UniProtKB/Swiss-Prot annotation:
One Pfam family, short name: Ribosomal_L9_C
Keywords of this entry: Ribonucleoprotein, Ribosomal protein, RNA-binding, rRNA-binding
InterPro entries from the UniProt entry: Ribosomal_bL9, Ribosomal_bL9/RNase_H1_N, Ribosomal_bL9_bac/chp, Ribosomal_bL9_C, Ribosomal_bL9_C_sf, Ribosomal_bL9_N, Ribosomal_bL9_N_sf
Coiled-coil stretches noted in the UniProt entry, renumbered to this chain: none
PROSITE patterns found in the cross-reference section: RIBOSOMAL_L9
Gene Ontology biological-process annotations: translation
GO molecular function: rRNA binding; structural constituent of ribosome
NCBIfam families, alphabetized: L9
Name listed for the protein in its UniProt record: Large ribosomal subunit protein bL9
Family designation: Belongs to the bacterial ribosomal protein bL9 family.
Amino acid sequence: MKIILTHEVSGLGAAGDVVDVKDGYARNYLIPRKFAIRWTKGGEKDVEQIRRARKIHEIQTIEQANQVKAQLEGVKVRLAVRSGDAGRLFGSVTPADVASAIKAAGGPEVDKRRIELGSPIKTLGAHETSVRLHPEVDAKVSIEVVAA
């Protein structure tokens, strides 16, 4: 089945790409989660609109990515969350929490889908995360999780 990706999907492509996937994968996973829409002849207009929107928000060059990387690595990110007595969090820290903490700390605005936690953050203390700015540039961000 031909689909148009509306979001970046690991292993398939970026938003605006037209890809061919198995019917079940499209119907049961991609389309219900709004990662893709069905390809139609009229969908070509949607592809151009998605590509234009992506171009505005995307970091275009490696130089831009390196500038954002320098800004990110210079920011001290501190995240206050509720926790129990043993230092375990109620829930976990999400990429959206990290993105808002980076912005609150004076860093650049980062898309939550670009933040890779590795494993869920469920304890207090210092943690390392990676932000994928460009296919060739990753920024390491250290986050200090403290009790609220």
